[in-house]
Amino acid sequence: KGRGNSRIYKLSINKNNSILLKDYPDLLVDSRPRMQTEVNALKLVEDLRKTPKVVAFDKLQNIALYEWIKGESVYRIEDYHIEQAVNFIENIQNLKEKDSWSQASEACFSAQQLIKQINSRFDKLLMIKNKNLNDFLIYTFKPLFNKVWESSEKNWPSNNLEKELPKSMQILSPSDFGFHNAILKESGDLVFLDFEYFGRDDPVK
């Protein structure tokens, strides 16, 4: 089963043991080093015991093998699931290697960067030839977005729209983090997946 643009396969070693093979997008299509980022991130957080272990990886083939996690998707979010997620994010911030990481994929450290990213995504969606989608974007989303941005701009600290958040206030983030990227084990413990976009980001985001 594929998540995003990566392809995932379950490889059965024997009757009781399996591993996960993840085939990442060609670097000619997406130049971001998603495989290496995920491998490095999972090695970084391995001692927290909330993520799959790295078994092996091949830079040339752009593939990696990971521990296969037995469990199911999170269909109903309970308080103890939220506690596990919050604790995991908090524990990541205490890792010694924190400052050596580059920024997460599509990280935003200023108001201008955030607006630029939203406008970029808006333009890409507008290129899709679908009347219902186009009407929603033009007549519903855009007016509301302009109204929200106008209000935000007025209430933002003066002369601070382009100022970037200092590194000391940034956090390590899995970026695409949430219960949609988690496996619930029979024990009730969550295992978090998909660290292809891991890096430093604004804690608000």
For each of these PLM feature ranges, what is it?
Residues 1-2:
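Protein kinase glycine-rich loop
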Residues 5-119, 124:
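ATP-binding pocket architecture of kinase catalytic cores
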Residues 17, 62, 169-171, 189-191:
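The start of beta-strands in P-loop NTPase/AAA+ ATPase cores
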Residues 28-29, 73, 182, 200-202:
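Conserved protein kinase catalytic core
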Residues 70, 179, 197-199:
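Short, glycine/acidic-enriched loop or turn micro-motifs at the edges of active sites
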Residues 172, 184-205:
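Active-site Asp-x-Gly
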Residues 178-180, 184:
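Catalytic-loop Lys-Pro-X-Asn motif of eukaryotic-like protein kinases
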